[in-house]
Curated annotation (Swiss-Prot):
Location in or out of the cell: Cytoplasm
Gene3D superfamilies for this protein: Methylthiotransferase, N-terminal domain, Nucleic acid-binding proteins, tm_1862 like domain
Organism the protein comes from: Afipia carboxidovorans (strain ATCC 49405 / DSM 1227 / KCTC 32145 / OM5) (Oligotropha carboxidovorans)
Catalytic activity: L-aspartate(89)-[ribosomal protein uS12]-hydrogen + (sulfur carrier)-SH + AH2 + 2 S-adenosyl-L-methionine = 3-methylsulfanyl-L-aspartate(89)-[ribosomal protein uS12]-hydrogen + (sulfur carrier)-H + 5'-deoxyadenosine + L-methionine + A + S-adenosyl-L-homocysteine + 2 H(+)
Name listed for the protein in its UniProt record: Ribosomal protein uS12 methylthiotransferase RimO
């Protein structure tokens, strides 16, 4: 590093939106201390790799990213979920500068300071009030808690990130307000278990504006809806009180729920240690759609869980036909070091997992195509993510970034990223919509 030249850091962020928020917090602190971000590893003084350790495939991706950083730079700091169990990382890469687990912001900063001292003292005015974001300017993830109190047998998140720790309501709302003032049009509310928000702090009230707001899922959602941006609720565990948020939907609280049901067969759900009354869940879904006809449901499922029989898998397919989930992600079960599900009997062979994954996704493709076809001829509000010469790419209220479908928008007038426009839907395929800006 040349004398008087700001030190440069290259940053790789892997994993889920919660991990992305952790990366944003680290980058915000580093920028406050005068560090600059480099676009390439070989143009940086050091590299930070924020890892994912949830699945073996994610671990391999993390190890690959570390290897790439070592090859192109050689001075590498590793953090994130995989860093909570550093043995495999140390075995492959013994010459790393530091390895830390998730949420260990101070340890990461200490490692940076040791390897690359800041050029000058922090000047907070280097930063925008909302901090540094890795998402596009028009949307941002808003993390309301850390950790999880559930003990799903397939999951090691509580071991990596600990039990639930909720942020005070006023703290969340202040961050959200800063984001909206900075131009964010969509807030994506995330955590490991969004609907458990506030349980650990006994729903403690805090002062916000001229009133008190309790740290409850529904109360927080209501207040976020007053800020003027779209509010999208993700990672919602299906607790009974989730029913209370449905009547809030239709304005800025988007008619969208991301609920990871994981399966539909009662016995499989018991082995997963998940809520098992899926007949009641179907009744709740029907009630939600009666209250909010425009509701979009996204969910994730696991096929090939240990002991899953053909009959149990068929229950999942039948349930899906009844539930008519709008957006679906599916994972083939894979053992994760430290997960209690590893001890379950009757593992499902890989070829059967693949066959079931294909069958589930084919079933969902038909459901998705049918549900999207109903939107042809309607008008939808669309937020623009990308612009081209004649067609822009955006998302309706039914689409979360990165994981859901898109709306392809033809327009005679120029559109900008972040614009929210009314689009007349003219065509649908299995996952996406196509239309043109209304009024032209």
């Amino acid at each position: 590093m040349n004398q008087g030249v700001p030190p440069k850091i290259s940053f790789v962020s892997l994993g889920c939106p919660k991990a992305l928020v952790d990366s944003e917090r680290i980058i915000t602190r580093l920028r406050a201390e005068g560090y600059e971000l480099a676009r390439k590893h070989d143009g940086a003084d050091i590299v930070i790799v924020s890892t994912c350790g949830f699945l073996d495939s994610a671990k391999q991706e993390s190890l690959g990213a570390i290897g790439e950083a070592m090859a192109e730079n050689g001075k590498v700091i590793v953090t994130g979920c995989m860093g909570a169990e550093p043995e495999q990382i140390e075995k492959e890469y013994p010459n790393l500068l530091s390895i830390t687990g998730p949420q260990q912001y101070e340890s990461v900063l200490d490692a940076v300071h040791r390897a690359l001292p800041p050029l000058h003292n922090p000047h907070l005015d280097l930063l925008p009030p909302q901090g540094i974001k890795l998402t596009p300017r028009h949307y941002a993830y808003l993390k309301i808690s850390e950790g999880c109190n559930n003990r799903c047998t397939f999951c090691i998140i509580p071991k990596l990130r600990g039990d639930l720790v909720s942020r005070p309501a006023d703290d969340v709302l202040r961050e959200a307000e800063k984001l909206v003032v900075a131009g964010v049009k969509e807030l994506l509310v995330v955590s490991q278990d969004t609907s458990a928000y506030g349980i650990d702090i006994k729903y403690a009230p805090s002062a916000w504006k001229d009133r008190e707001v309790r740290a409850r899922f529904v109360d927080l959602a209501r207040e976020l809806g007053e800020l003027g941006a779209w509010v999208r609720l993700q990672y919602v565990y299906p607790y009974p009180h989730v029913d209370d948020v449905i009547p809030l939907m239709g304005g800025n609280i988007l008619p969208y729920l991301d609920i990871p049901f994981q399966h539909a067969n009662t016995e499989v759900l018991k082995r997963m240690r998940r809520p098992a009354a899926q007949d009641k869940t179907l009744a709740r879904i029907h009630k939600w759609r009666e209250q909010c006809p425009d509701l979009t449901l996204r969910s994730t499922f696991i096929v090939g869980f240990p002991g899953e029989t053909e009959s149990e898998f068929q229950d999942l397919l039948d349930w899906l036909d009844e539930a008519q989930i709008d957006r679906l992600g599916c994972f083939k079960y894979e053992p994760v070091a430290g997960a209690t599900s590893n001890a379950l009997e009757n593992p499902v062979p890989d070829e059967i997992k693949t066959a079931r994954w294909n069958a589930l996704m084919a079933r969902q493709q038909k459901i998705s195509a049918q549900r999207l076809k109903r939107k042809v001829g309607t008008r939808q509000q669309v937020i623009i993510d990308e612009v081209g010469p004649s067609v822009a790419k955006g998302r309706s209220k039914a689409d979360a970034p990165q994981i859901d479908g898109s709306v392809y928008v033809a327009s005679r007038r120029p559109l900008k990223v972040g614009d929210i426009v009314t689009v007349k839907i003219e065509r649908a395929d299995e996952y996406d919509l196509h239309g043109s800006v209304a009024g032209f």
